[in-house]
Structure formats: structure tokens, C-alpha cells
Amino acid sequence: MMQRGESLITRARNNCVAKFLENKEWTHLFWIDSDIGFSPDSFYRLLLADKDVVAGVYPLKRENWPEAGLPAGMTQADFERMYTSYTVNTNDKNENGEIVLKVDEEGFMKVHDAPTGFMVIKRSVFEKMMAAYPELNYISDSDYNREDKGLH
């Protein structure tokens, strides 16, 4: 399912979730933003991970240029490795207060929030949220004739 011409990303995602929930045979919702590059292997890795929510890591759209300038002879690969920020946020810190990335044997890690540009969510997550938070029932403000089907 594609969302085109929607300038408000939150509304576009909410409309996608509502459409997803209308189709009972769909088991996973996979967000892939149009500006995210990924390999087919990465796609299948997330889809088959059997996690309630799982997201791929990708670079933020900014570089952290060093204040002193670039070292002589630096290659693009060196620059990307040293100065690119990624969409990883965790609260895990060691005794010195330094952030520690705890990666499991499958190459995944728990985070306190994750980017939605390359993310898979199981249907059961939405069903649990609907049961726990019925007051968050979603009605699109972009489709005034849309029937309220009780979907979030």
C-alpha cells in the first residue's frame, strides 16, 4: 500500500494502519520510507525476525563535520564511518555513564525508541494497543466520509 501526496507523515501512517487493520489476513505492517535505501536481505531479515516491533538502522540526513576540518587523505568511506550519525537510541550505560550498545546473537538490540522509516510491526501489537487504549480510536481528518470502523 502506498501513500502519495500526503504532506503530514503522522496522518499518512495512521491512515495506513487503519487500512492494514481492515485487512484481517495481513499479519505485518512494514514501513519503508521512499528515501531509505536497503537491500533485499535487510527487508527479509526484518520481516522474518519474529519480533513484535523491529526496525532497521539507517544514517541520519546530516553529517557531524569535525570542527578542525577533515584530516588529510580522508576517504569518503572513512568520513562515513567516523562522522555519520545513525538512528540508534538506547538508555543502556556503563558505570562511567557511557552509552553501551548491547547487540544480541542475532544482531538485534533493544532500544527505547526506533526510527519508523524501515520498521516492521506485527498485527498483534495494534490489537493489544486497541484493547488497552480504546480512547485512542483513530478517525482520519482527511476523509470526512470515512466510516468509523473502530480501528485505531
Indicate residue ranges for each PLM-predicted region.
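Residue-level detector of alpha-helix boundaries and kinks
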Residues: M1-M2, E106
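Short beta->alpha junction loops
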Residues: M2-I9
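Glycine-/small-residue-rich active-site loops that bind phosphorylated ligands and cofactors
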Residues: L8, G37-F38
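Short, conserved alpha-helix that lines the donor NDP-sugar binding/gating region
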Residues: I9-E22
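Conserved catalytic core of nucleotide-sugar-dependent glycosyltransferases
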Residues: V17, S39-L151
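Alpha-helix termini
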Residues: F20-W26, Y133
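Short beta-strand-to-loop acidic/aromatic patch adjacent to the donor-nucleotide binding site
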Residues: K24-G37
